[in-house]
Regions:
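Conserved catalytic core of the tyrosine transesterase superfamily
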Residues: 1-322
């Protein structure tokens, strides 16, 4: 019996632009997050600038086209990781076109790249950042930024997740927080350390009791944006003498300290909201050889924060921080 080729035959082709619009429609039907849709759109524009004419039939794209795109990006002196980020979009798009029968089958491989090791925050830097602000002179903004840094380190959450938190998402009696907005549209309940529960209890004393209000707001009570959050962390870190200002670096630091404390990679995967163990394995490969026998808790904030803090609570003016 002759083996059948089960690959779809190449169909009458749409243009490149039409195919991409159908691809994005497919992604919306899959209920991809807006962040993912924006990612595909941005990387698509980069690929289309290289192609020049997106009104030509999609079947004109070949394996050689992709190879030329790689050379084009290399000529622009893009980093290997950036090239691979662009290629992942191209691969997802063109593989979908192959499944639809718009293209002949061919393989798209990423370029070899050394994974850059992002240096996490050091213990000295964390001690500076986690030092409680002067309760007599501190503004709401500085206090809020201190709470934000504690929250990022204490949960390992993404900045986008933090921005979408509502006051009602905290259940401090149970010691948990509900993450309603995550990268892959997942939602999950994450435990909070004792140190972070105490910090959040005090922070909520200066906030409104409305459970639907944003957890972290501007000095005027407005919803923070990703840009304003980034600026807040940038200013706060520099005010503490720390040059590193990446919000995502708190996530890497959380993972590093968790692994070094002997934490279970499978549990770390769940805590960080990763769809699989790929990223968690990278953390283990980077940090597992650095285990410290004297760590007595898995949560990094618990290791670095004194639970019994002293000093007067911050005095807020009427309506400030509400």
């Amino acid at each position: 019996m002759r083996n059948r080729d089960l690959r779809p035959a190449v169909k009458a082709n749409p243009t490149i632009q039409q195919a991409f619009e159908r691809f994005q429609k497919y992604n919306r039907l899959k209920n991809l997050s807006q962040g993912s849709l924006d990612f595909y759109a941005a990387k698509g524009r980069s690929f289309f600038r290289f192609l020049g004419d997106t009104e030509q039939p999609i079947h004109t794209i070949t394996e050689e086209t992709v190879e030329d795109y790689i050379f084009y990006m290399e000529d622009q002196q893009l980093h290997d990781t950036t090239i691979n980020t662009n290629l992942r979009m191209v691969r997802a798009f063109l593989y979908w076109c192959m499944e639809k029968g718009y293209l002949e089958q061919f393989s798209i491989k990423l370029v070899r790249a050394d994974d850059p090791i992002k240096e996490p925050y050091t213990t000295d830097e964390l001690q500076r950042l986690l030092k409680e602000p002067d309760c007599k002179t501190c503004s709401f903004a500085e206090y809020r930024n201190w709470v934000i840094v504690n929250f990022l380190l204490g949960t390992g959450c993404r900045a986008s997740t933090l921005l979408n938190l509502q006051i009602g998402d905290l259940d401090l009696s149970a010691g948990t927080v509900f993450f309603r907005h995550m990268k892959a549209r997942n939602q999950q309940i994450v435990p909070l350390s004792k140190a972070l529960v105490k910090i959040m209890e005090e922070y909520l004393e200066h906030r409104t009791s409305d459970p639907t209000a944003p957890l972290f707001v501007s000095e005027y009570g407005n919803q923070m944006t990703l840009n304003s959050l980034g600026n807040a962390v940038w200013n706060y870190n520099h005010s503490r003498g720390v040059d590193k200002t990446s919000m995502h670096l708190f996530r890497h630091t959380y993972a590093k300290l968790y692994i070094q404390a002997g934490g279970d990679p499978f549990r770390l995967q769940k805590l960080l909201g990763h769809a699989d163990l790929t990223m968690t394995r990278r953390y283990v490969a980077l940090y597992a050889d650095d285990l410290r026998a004297n760590y007595d808790a898995l949560n990094p904030l618990e290791q670095l924060t004194r639970i019994n803090r002293h000093g007067d609570k911050i005095k807020m003016g009427k309506g400030e921080g509400k």
